[in-house]
From Swiss-Prot:
Its main location: cytoplasm. Pathway: Porphyrin-containing compound metabolism; protoporphyrin-IX biosynthesis; coproporphyrinogen-III from 5-aminolevulinate: step 4/4. It comes from Campylobacter jejuni subsp. jejuni serotype O:6 (strain 81116 / NCTC 11828). NCBIfam families: hemE. Homodimer. PROSITE patterns: UROD_1, UROD_2. This is Uroporphyrinogen decarboxylase.
Length: 340
């Protein structure tokens, strides 16, 4: 698998590519399946449909890896939190956590056993996927998941989380630790079900100041990665903490790929990290609106990463109104332009 080879810094015939949110709303085929499922959460829980949409970008765009269709918040859902998705508002928890009592009500022993719909989707997808295409399993970072559990929804300033961080850091650490233990088991089950690689999404890393990022987010991601790498050394682990270009000097640990978001200069990440890790990223997703912008972005990134281990990706998820033609052009251009 070219994607796995790149994760481990092995030579590849061209730069492998996939896109975050590649199974998504920009594809009419995805919208059709989502309509059949009824709503987003029902689609996540219907393993056959989740598998179908996971495979669509492979069939339509010929990306080098599929990522399983799911959501980072199915974990707190199966721990006992009441999750719903509101149109225009995103995910909402009706019972956010603010006390130790709230936390103790959550089931961390059985949550990973209730996520069979994710494992079934992985099994089915791996069966249908051609042998040269990788299948990526994933989870959110403990910090990013915790922000939703504490705020009750998405947030602009993370005031409830940060209030807890400064007033009651012990409680926040307990929440993060509980999540970390569940996520280890969850990812292990994903690997057993057929995931060839694991990505940990830390979407809200940039909400934390320098020292607090390492204490409350990065260290927990490393604990998960250490667990996976000690048991499954052949499974690459990708970390994607978004928006922390000023923190790169302290990034170190036992993982394989570092995801670079579009706001981080790729040459900066290359100079600081490419001796240790394969880099993944980092094209600005809005470049996909225009073919000239795509071409310019692809050329610049390939030049920056010349002779370095690299997986091409966007620097965040693909947007819902990107023309499919442009996405196809992007994938093909990367694969052809980078061919050795």
């Amino acid at each position: 698998m070219i994607f796995i080879d790149a994760c481990f810094k092995k030579p590849t015939p061209y730069t492998p590519i996939w896109m975050m949110r590649q199974a998504g709303r920009y594809l009419p085929e995805y919208m059709e399946v989502r309509k059949q499922a009824g709503d987003f959460l029902s689609l996540c829980k219907d393993y056959k449909k989740a598998s179908e949409v996971s495979l669509q970008p492979i069939d339509i765009l010929d990306v080098d890896a599929a990522i399983i269709f799911s959501d980072i918040l199915v974990v707190p859902l199966e721990m006992g939190m009441n999750l719903r998705f509101e149109k225009g508002e995103g995910p909402v928890f009706d019972n956010p956590i603010s006390t130790l009592e709230d936390l103790e009500k959550l089931d961390d022993q059985n949550a990973h056993k209730k996520l069979n719909y994710v494992y079934d989707a992985l099994k089915l997808t791996r069966e249908k996927l051609s042998q040269n295409k990788a299948l990526i399993g994933f989870c959110g970072s403990p910090w990013t998941i915790a922000t939703y559990m504490i705020e009750g929804s998405g947030s602009k300033n993370y005031a409830k989380c940060k209030k807890m961080l400064y007033q009651n850091p012990e409680l926040l650490h307990k929440i993060l630790n509980k999540l970390t233990q569940v996520l280890k088991l969850y990812l292990e089950e994903q690997i057993k079900a057929g995931a060839n690689a694991i990505q940990i999404f830390d979407s809200w890393a940039s909400a934390l100041e320098y020292d607090k990022f390492f204490e409350f987010s990065f260290n927990y991601m490393l604990e998960i990665s250490n667990f996976i790498k000690s048991k499954y050394p052949n499974i690459p682990v990708i970390l994607f903490p978004k928006g922390i270009s000023g923190y790169l000097d302290r990034i170190d640990g036992n993982f394989d790929v570092f995801g670079v978001d579009w706001s981080t200069p790729l040459d900066l990440a290359r100079d600081k990290l490419s001796h240790k890790y394969t880099l993944q990223g980092n094209m600005e997703p809005c470049r996909l609106y225009d073919k000239n912008a795509i071409k310019e972005g692809v050329e610049k990134i390939l030049k920056t990463m010349q002779n370095k281990a690299h997986i091409f990706n966007l620097g965040h998820g693909i947007l819902p109104d990107i023309p499919v033609e442009n996405a196809k052009y992007f994938i093909k251009l990367v694969q052809e332009s980078s061919a050795k």
